Amino acid sequence: MTAITPDPLAIRPELSGDTPPGPLPGRGSGTTALRVGAATVWLSVIVLLPLAAIAWQSAGGGWHAFWLAVSSNAAVESFRVTLTISAGVTVLNLVFGLVIAWVLVRDDFPGKRLVDAIIDLPFALPTIVASLVMLALYGNNSPIGLHLQHTSWGVTVALAFVTLPFVVRAVQPVLLELDRETEEAAASLGASGPKIFTSVVLPSLLPALLSGAGLAFSRAIGEFGSVVLIGGAVPGKTEVSSQWIRTLIENDDRTGAAAISIVLLAISFVVLLILRIVGGHAAKREELSA
């Protein structure tokens, strides 16, 4: 007798390429809906509802009261101080954050891991402690002879301290993934070090730099704890908007405080949106040129 070999496709038709595959584990519509629902609820409770509440409170006195709150001399001066110092701090951290990230990725030296861990210290340190540290180092009894208490430079140093990690941590992963062969090829063609950096490395780092700058700027304009002691809230000099908000709350003007908060939120959102768009275009250009 001739042995008949069973056709495996007849026994298990799902092995045939003509049979559409079933849903992958964890991708069912019910599971997806559950995940999306949980994410939406959590995002609403933690972010959206508080933002809606502060917007509602800022409109409690009507448009006229809102405008009076944000256009008063004290408010305008606090905006000026906040934006000026925050912009300066962002530029400083862009430069030195890039240098630090470069050193941590491209150079080897004793204590490298310790330095890398110290970068995250401002994230873990309570901001009021950061202000106390700044006061101890740069206050009237400064052990190094730098008396920055109640000066804009003191506020600048404090904000630079708490925002530096944003740039470093944004740039580091991109530097680690950069293809060194492209740099070596440019060098073999006679390109100088600065030319290689500006034409090969910097375009690849631009999206990360913009992302870090946006986060650093947004953190700086809303910072309170790190500047409260070293700055001293001198009107028109060191009083940032967050300190003016505290003054309004202490004077039982919660509507005015909410109005100032909305302006800061709007500025932060617009800056992040613009930098995200610019960074996205830069990333696309980099992909097309690769």
Predicted features and spans:
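Short, Lys/Arg-rich, polar N-terminal cytosolic tail immediately upstream
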Residues: 2-29
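Short, Lys/Arg-enriched, Gly/Pro-containing loop segments at transmembrane-helix junctions
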Residues: 182, 281-290
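The alpha-helix within a helix-turn-helix
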Residues: 186
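Glycine/proline-centered hinge or cleavage motifs at structural transition points of membrane proteins
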Residues: 189-190, 203
